[in-house]
Regions:
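Hydrophobic alpha-helical segments within soluble ligand-binding/sensing domains
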Residues: 101-133, 144, 240-248, 269-276
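Short beta-strand segments enriched in small/hydrophobic residues
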Residues: 1-17, 132-135
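Extracellular/periplasmic bilobed ligand-binding domains
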Residues: 72-84, 130-133, 141-236
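Short, solvent-exposed amphipathic alpha-helices that sit
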Residues: 12-29, 109-112, 140-159
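Beta-alpha junction/loop-to-helix N-cap segments that form part of ligand/metal-binding clefts
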Residues: 12-16, 31-92
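Segments of small-molecule ligand-sensing domains
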Residues: 255-325
Length: 331
């Protein structure tokens, strides 16, 4: 298990992923047939040396790292001493023979949502309205999300334009939108900001948002319900572990009782990384995990080194806000 140094920001953020890997390994190897050993990676450039050390120690599989720089370094190596399941995506399309990566980035979610939006509004493409409007703020993460949405929509064959909205502009949004024909609207902002904007958009306009904009992520159930009323009908994506918590609760009850919803997402990534690893350890050129906790997982080595992850399409409703057995908080 390739981990970041203890006490580092990335180590704390990735802790639920490690919890998921450990929980899945215990579930699968109750007989003690497998041992998990952690190797710290401080400098991305040392990734090769760390993998060699693990292989020399008798390791047969490496799960991690999470750091994008470290994953990039490994993906550019000509040879790997053992199979690797990286938990991030490299920028390039080429990678060593024994390299596999599971993509947990916001960009991968945006790409899937853009395809859904284009398909759901196909009838509008025949009209004057072919462009989507992307509503965002000056927040750096929102900006990153908006740029990803624009690129994904263009790639999917639609037009897109970004608009920055500040609190003092909200009152003028309805007037500004009057007379404009859009195929749909994307929210590149959190649920609170999205819920404030939605009433100012035409009610018939289809709206879309990633899980970041989903009000079910609110800790306060009343606030979640209020925001869900405003965002009623918004199409978004979630991981199966959020849509169907019963399996996760039953299988990993003791492991995830104190996890927030965001931590649950990362925990689920760890479980799926372990599942992929148990198949990748045999150098399987094709892998299918239809019941993955983070989505339907599929991999074809002939098509590249990245695992395709299909999330669950869901529609926001005030009748479906938060899971009562999960403590919700943003981290």
């Amino acid at each position: 298990l390739i981990v970041s140094p203890k006490g580092s920001v990335l180590s704390e953020a990735a802790a639920p992923i490690q919890q998921g890997i450990l929980a899945a390994s215990r579930e699968a190897t109750a007989s003690g047939a497998c041992e998990l050993v952690q190797y710290e990676l401080s400098n991305p450039q040392d990734a090769g040396a760390v993998l060699k050390k693990a292989a020399d120690d008798g390791a047969v599989l490496a799960i991690g790292p999470v750091s994008r720089d470290a994953v990039q370094t490994i993906s550019e190596m000509p040879y790997l001493p053992l199979p690797v399941v990286a938990i991030n995506r490299p920028s390039g399309e080429t990678a060593p023979e024994l390299f596999l990566s599971i993509d947990i980035s916001a960009e991968s979610e945006v790409e899937q949502l853009a395809k859904i939006a284009v398909e759901n509004t196909a009838q509008k493409a025949d009209l004057a309205a072919n462009n989507f409007v992307i509503l965002t703020t000056q927040d750096p993460y929102d900006e990153r999300l908006a740029r990803a949405m624009e690129a994904a929509l263009v790639k999917a064959g639609a037009g897109a334009e970004r608009r920055h909205i500040s609190s003092d502009q909200i009152a003028y949004l309805r007037q500004e939108m009057r007379g404009k024909a859009f195929r749909g609207a994307f929210f590149a902002m959190n649920a609170q900001n999205a819920s404030l904007l939605r009433p100012y958009l035409p009610p018939e306009l289809p709206v879309f948002g990633t899980s970041y904009s989903n009000p079910m992520h609110q800790k306060d159930s009343m606030l979640a319900k209020t925001q869900s009323n405003d965002l009623n009908g918004m199409i978004t994506l979630e991981i199966p572990a959020e849509e169907n918590t019963s399996t996760l609760v039953a299988q990993y009850k003791g492991e995830r009782e104190n996890l927030s919803l965001e931590e649950l997402q990362m925990f689920s990534v760890g479980v799926d990384a372990w599942t992929l690893g148990t198949k990748w350890i045999d150098w399987a050129r094709r892998i299918e995990v239809p019941d993955g906790l983070t989505g339907r997982l599929s991999f074809d080595k002939d098509s590249g080194s990245k695992v395709k992850r299909e999330l669950v399409k869901t529609v926001v409703s005030p009748n479906k806000t938060a899971h009562p057995d999960l403590p919700l908080k943003r981290i």
